[in-house]
Amino acid sequence: MKRILQYILRIFSKIILRKYKPEIVAITGSVGKTSAKEAIYQVLGKYFRVRSNKRNYNNEIGVPLTILGIEGGGGSFLLWAKVFLKAIRIIISGGDYPEILVLEMGVDRPGDMAYLTGFVPVDAAVITAIGEFPTHLEFFPEKDELIGEKSILAKSVVKEGLVVLNYDDISVRMMADGLPEGIKTITYGFGEGASIQISNYNFYLSDLDKGDYGATFKLEYEGSIVPFRIEKMIGKQQVFAVAAAAGVGMGFGLNLVEISNAFKKMFNLPGRTNLIKGIKKSWVIDDTYNASPLATI
């Protein structure tokens, strides 16, 4: 049943992508890909018509459903029949399809990334971080095999496309080597060699009860330095997400000031660096969602 669903969804996706020709931003990594996806959506969504994955729609079923803009049918044959009818209507009727799709692409086992990039033409690829102890290693005998699988995304970018890489993660930084000619590469990180350099990171706290806290930092790109002040942001992992989004935003013609204006408040995801009020005047940082060691340290 699953293979049949995959096949049908893949066909519908290819038809819709060929019909509407949206630009596609794809994100992967073992750490921070969902936060990066949300940050990219927040930036691009301010200036373009954009759609991104909802919930955990980042696999061979979820990515096509995001392309279709339809909820899945679960275990119901009748609901899946309705999904396919909706897809046919989208193909026939036309309409106000998004200009840009922001797609998180998860990798659980060998072949996953090759499958997704086999029918999704990627204009901009973002690789967040792998880390020393990455998640999702159950089906990969060695860490290098997982890295190789994720690097397929960078190598699959269309001619004259964009690849955005985490400079501070050596495994990700090295993915810039051997990319096809004509691909533009932007790196981001705290390291001095990053294209987009993060600096002056500080956490401010005025009143937790009133939600008056957040982070300030600066992003520098090609001599331009712009300060960022983002409410309700805690942790450097979210700063990395913003920097990744800045790289994508500039690939779509935005400047750092326009990107900064999209981040007055931080997106909040369940289980990802959220503050929860505890007992005895304590506060708990909830960063528990499928967390890897790198994401929580």
For each predicted feature, which ranges?
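ATP-dependent carboxylate-amine ligase catalytic core
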Residues: 10, 14-20, 45-148, 235, ...
